[in-house]
Design a protein with these regions (language model features):
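Non-heme iron-sulfur electron-transfer modules
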Residues: 2-3, 27-60, 78-104, 402-412
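Short amphipathic alpha-helical interaction patches enriched in hydrophobic/aromatic residues
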Residues: 28, 48, 72-75, 266, ...
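Alpha-helix capping and helix-loop boundary segments enriched in small/acidic/polar residues
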Residues: 12, 31-35, 223-230
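Iron-sulfur cluster-binding electron-transfer modules in prokaryotic oxidoreductases
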Residues: 81-423
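N-terminal glycine-rich anion-binding loops that anchor highly charged ligand groups
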Residues: 19-22, 32-37, 210-212
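Cysteine-centered iron-sulfur cluster-binding motifs in ferredoxin-type domains/subunits
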Residues: 9-27, 55, 59-79, 316, ...
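Short, intrinsically disordered, charge-biased short linear motifs at domain edges
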Residues: 1-11, 51-62, 171, 204-208, ...
Length: 423
């Protein structure tokens, strides 16, 4: 219960003003108090103070939260409902430990090699042409709706995870101006290898020597989302120790979720006297790729991209890191690219980690609103800096029969530089 104590005074301060209701994606879909930040705060308080049993039904309301953090920003008295929800999930894991969580997060996701082995069938599905055959024969239409949508979420998988083929050091082109540590996220390595390879090309082209340690583990966000706080702390200690071996100016990642989590390592380990200072120093160095590139002088891209683009703000970037101007600034560097802002660009797309699996109907309802906003822009490209958002948006667009492509802003910048051919 220790995680709850610092927040106990705050949640008693809830004045039930209802401002959080207007921004909560789950409340907007169901108009139920228990699906709102205000309702979850009340349930947490009553459960922890003994007025209600900490039952599976009560805890399920905490898992219904998409952790988009809009409620944190809008609360006039400083309650942070999204953080309280994560703490309540930890309480549930303490009271009723779930073995599958330990197996998944301590076993499968603790080592990159184990996770890569687990996804081998998916790569074979792509490499052997089975996926192409499934679509050619229309067999995908025979799958149950949920399975069909999950299959459609998968991008075109690389034959090998990027972590396996990426050199630990990528030299700067020309004079080295910066020495950068690169945190390659699990999803980026397994699913979006081409995208992260593009990120490294952009960094190298602009005078950065990039160090990408192969020994890093998961950032810890999946384990945190399911209440396994001790595992998050273990990941943090390991990753900090890995990067301490290298003298880098900054630690950069092109995954919004990873970046948001890495920046919280100082908070996660603030109670640990041995690690608190090291974690705080590590967190200060972490930057999203767009954040870092916006701080350094960049070469002007030579290639034009004559298309309309719109930008979706990932929750873990806009609210988790307060980064939203920088990606747009990068897009503005590309000649011919017309940025058309969508309505509610910073509203959650419904991805939220595993929510498309665990809260399928809600995730699709939230995504529907986002797709309507995208369609209104008539953009041919949707840019976003989060792999989860990219998969969610791509699936929704395909489901509506639309051909707009979903890409990382830095991948577009790399394209304007000439990509791999421009090296």
């Amino acid at each position: 219960m220790d995680l709850i104590k610092p927040q106990q005074d705050k949640y008693h301060n809830c004045i039930r003003c209802g401002l959080c209701l207007a921004v909560c994606p789950t409340y907007r879909e169901y108009l139920k108090e228990t699906a709102s930040p205000r309702g979850r705060v009340a349930l947490a308080r009553k459960g922890l103070e003994g007025e209600l049993e900490l039952s599976p039904n009560l805890i399920e309301q905490m898992y219904g939260c998409f952790a988009c953090m809009e409620c944190n920003d809008i609360c006039p008295v400083g309650i942070r409902p999204a953080e309280l929800v994560l703490s309540m999930r930890h309480v549930q894991q303490q009271l009723h430990p779930a073995r599958w969580k330990r197996i998944l997060f301590k076993g499968l996701m603790s080592k990159a090699g184990w996770l890569e082995a687990a996804t081998l069938p998916l790569r074979l599905y792509e490499k052997l042409g089975i996926r192409r055959l499934v679509y050619l024969l229309g067999m995908n239409r025979l799958l149950p709706g949920r399975i069909r949508d999950l299959e459609a979420m998968l991008p075109r998988l690389p034959q090998r995870p990027l972590r396996r083929v990426l050199p630990e050091a990528t030299a700067a082109r020309g004079v080295e101006r910066y020495r950068i540590g690169f945190f390659l996220g699990c999803a980026q390595s397994l699913l979006f290898g081409d995208q992260s390879a593009a990120t490294l090309r952009v960094l190298a082209r602009n005078g950065c020597t990039v160090i990408a340690p192969k020994e890093i583990e998961c950032c810890g966000m999946p384990a945190r989302g399911y209440g396994c706080v001790d595992l998050v702390e273990n990941h943090a200690r390991h990753n900090i120790a890995v990067f301490e071996q290298f003298n880098v100016d900054a630690i950069v990642t092109d995954c919004a979720t990873c970046g948001s989590t890495l920046k919280e390592y100082g908070s996660f380990l603030s109670h640990d006297s041995e690690w608190a200072e090291r974690a705080a120093g590590f967190a200060r160095k972490v930057k999203d790729i767009s954040e870092f590139l916006a701080e350094i002088p960049l070469l002007k891209p030579a290639k034009r991209i004559d298309m309309k683009v719109t930008y979706h703000d990932p929750c873990h970037l806009r609210r988790g890191q307060r980064v939203w101007k920088e990606p747009r600034r990068l897009l503005s560097l590309i000649d011919g690219l017309e940025l058309v802002e969508m309505r509610e660009s910073d509203r959650c797309c419904g991805s939220a980690g595993s929510q498309l699996i665990t809260h399928y109907d809600t995730a699709w309802k939230v995504l529907g609103r986002k797709l309507d906003c995208i369609l209104h822009t008539e953009a041919r490209i949707v840019a976003s800096g989060c792999p989860g958002c990219q998969m969610q948006l791509n699936t929704g667009l395909r489901r509506r029969g639309l051909s707009a492509r979903v890409v990382h802003p830095v991948a577009l910048l790399d394209e304007a530089y000439g990509g791999a051919d421009g090296e």
